């Protein structure tokens, strides 16, 4: 058991700090704003309208999501933090000496400090990379992480500025001698389930196969929310929640910034959430409060009052569902940790998976 974990977490309360000398590698291959503009236009031409979820994760969105994570009804962060505080020593034991730890979509890095502290106390030389699409969030998150952990003798902190796809391309260029003891991917916050099942399978498969193709052993430490209690789930995504509203509606501001003009007038839009029991996910969408016509270049799009535009989903995957997904791409669960309540349906489930053979 790692002592004083709560103290480590409390050091991250201040959001902004002066950036440190922690190296950040820019791995972004293309200007993401141009890609997003194309995705916005294309998404509004589909029969089922959609906007890219990356609109939610700009610099302002990262801060607003942090507010959501700290809200009273958002159980995911609390459960995951509890698991980390209880099992961080066990998790650290699965990460080899001299290996690389890459966190996918690192966000504020509050919870990460618990695991890195356990690695430091176990005297394991590990190189930690925080991957994020937001440069501002990455710089400030790493600075706060460095401040919270203090002087590190064994764990080295670095950053990767880019997307998941950029990370896969970057991994393909890594020589085994640089990561001879392998890579552990850390994917927390239930972020994997923001993708649909097939998308998550594809990303996991490509990450592991890229490592195997480069001769690099790898494993994945991932948290999954499998809560089936609908009142608890929908309480976390209550549309009356101001933190949730601020976070989701910021996505339209982000879209306007990407497009270079106010295409989405805030007063014309609201958002909603719905539980899809078949897909085991909460779906979040925008909807206009009146009939609107959106003009983007030569692509006018008429949207009727109440018509849904999907933006993000959050999976609530039961264990059999998740295991089946892994088996479909040749992965297997090696270990599993739950929170102390032992209510499976309420717990994010950190799992370690490896690529067999």
UniProtKB/Swiss-Prot annotation:
Keywords: Alkaloid metabolism, Methyltransferase, S-adenosyl-L-methionine, Transferase. InterPro entries: EgtD_Methyltrsf_superfamily, MeTrfase_dom, MeTrfase_EgtD-like, SAM-dependent_MTases_sf, SAM_MeTrfase_EasF-type_put. It comes from the Eukaryota. Transmembrane segments: none annotated. Disulfide bonds: none annotated. Pathway: Alkaloid biosynthesis. Gene3D superfamilies: Vaccinia Virus protein VP39. Pfam families: Methyltransf_33 (PF10017). Disruption phenotype: Abolishes the production of ditryptophenaline. One of its GO terms (molecular function) is methyltransferase activity. PANTHER family: ERGOTHIONEINE BIOSYNTHESIS PROTEIN 1 (PTHR43397), HISTIDINE-SPECIFIC METHYLTRANSFERASE SAM-DEPENDENT DOMAIN-CONTAINING PROTEIN (PTHR43397:SF2). Belongs to the methyltransferase superfamily. N-methyltransferase; part of the gene cluster that mediates the biosynthesis of the dimeric diketopiperazine alkaloid ditryptophenaline. The nonribosomal peptide synthase dtpA accepts L-tryptophan and L-phenylalanine as its substrates and forms the phenylalanyl-tryptophanyl cyclic dipeptide product cyclophenylalanyltryptophenyl. The N-methyltransferase dtpB is responsible for the N-methylation of cyclophenylalanyltryptophenyl to yield cyclo-N-methylphenylalanyltryptophenyl. This is N-methyltransferase dtpB. It comes from Aspergillus flavus (strain ATCC 200026 / FGSC A1120 / IAM 13836 / NRRL 3357 / JCM 12722 / SRRC 167).
